[in-house]
Amino acid sequence: MAWADKYRPVDISELIMPSDELNSIIRWADSWRNNEVIKKSLILYGDPGTGKTTTATVIANYLNVPLIEMNASDERNADSMKRVALMSSLYSDLLSERRIPDRLILIDEADNIFESRDPKRGGDYGGITELLNVVKETRNPVIITMNDYYSFRSKRSGREIIDNSLVIEMRPYRRRNDQRYREFINKCLERCHYILKKEGKSLPENDIIRIIKENEPDIRSIINDLEAYAQDSNPGTRNKKIDIYRYVIDTFHSHDYDKLINSFSDADFDPDYYIKWIDQNLKEEYQDPEDLKNAYDILSIADLYSRLSYRANYMLTGISQEIAAGVSLMVKNKNRSTGRYSMPDIIKMYSSRKGINGARTLLEKLAALNHTSSNVIVSYLWFYRIIKRTAEFKRISRILDLSDNEVKQI
């Protein structure tokens, strides 16, 4: 089991969030426990990986009730919202005389509930309107999660749902120079040390801090990277991962191109590894569409030379690296602060404890099915994670002859 799942918080004291928000959530849960409800639903919104669904699970544990979840993969039009959410929330156990809740309803990714303007077109018409009815009439607590709060607020009935809910933004800090940021880093560091101790692993303190700062505030990504680093038995490889971070910073922020090029002679990584890091983090560094276009134009040329070096002339390898190092030369609006750089997705897969060989064969099989490359297919694994929930996946698995280990990696 992946560490992010194995060490997912189960107790409310394990949640990594500011004290004010945590206390507000506890008071909301206690209002249901004490039959003193003011707001019947709780909205948790924020970026992926900030703990929205985990928080809902922990609250269910706190209330000692089962969690009934309707997520983005379920059909969520008006009829299904009535049938599943409304029935689950309105009717308590008929054999119970308790006036406290006997279940917690989770509506996950509510900002993805779309409403058709024309009822005849079907789809998600009326879904949010019915969700409003649930929020108003429920006899059990309802938690609604979303990534795009402002998009949800602009939808039909969205604002009224918000007005009838306690709203918590899952954002651990506002600025990196405030007290909340330091508290968040310390809590993450404490959690990482706890996980490493339970797993019998160790990493230098500086490496752990680097992992946290590369991924924050995405706690899930922090733990995923922690696992990938800790499972790498070769300290030299771990040092290479830390070292590449400094080169990425220099690529995006250094004003001395010649100095950057000369420093590659001391680098302990190959050009393809470097190009993957730049590609992964380019969109986090530059926001202007024209800047991104120009930077990707440069990177595509570097990638072409990198591929040619494997097929024709190894001497082209160094040229590909020098070209990639020049991405910032074509950018007008540079980011003044250092971004949250993360390890390339494909490198994470290769580095994880699930096995380099298994990851490689999985990508090769999916790439062959789609007539593309392994580098391309890694960006579409999210699609196969959705397909995996359906009966159709069994047929695909048989066609590709996927092993149990390969299936687990999707």
From Swiss-Prot:
SMART domains xref list: AAA
Q: Which UniProt keywords apply?
A: ATP-binding, DNA replication, Nucleotide-binding
Q: Which GO terms describe its biological process?
A: DNA replication
**One Pfam family in the UniProt entry:** AAA
Instruction: Cite a single GO MF annotation.
Output: ATP hydrolysis activity
Show the InterPro entries listed in the entry: AAA+_ATPase, ATPase_AAA_core, P-loop_NTPase, Rep_factor-C_lsu
For this UniProt entry, which segments traverse the membrane?
none
**Which residues make up the binding site for ATP?**
G46, D47, P48, G49, T50, G51, K52, T53
What HAMAP family does the entry give? RfcL
Q: Which NCBIfam families match?
A: PRK04195.1-5
UniProt similarity note: Belongs to the activator 1 small subunits family. RfcL subfamily.
What subunit structure does UniProt give? Heteromultimer composed of small subunits (RfcS) and large subunits (RfcL).
Biological function: Part of the RFC clamp loader complex which loads the PCNA sliding clamp onto DNA.
Q: Give the protein name, as stated in the record.
A: Replication factor C large subunit
What is the species of this protein?
A: Picrophilus torridus (strain ATCC 700027 / DSM 9790 / JCM 10055 / NBRC 100828 / KAW 2/3)
What gene name does this entry carry? rfcL
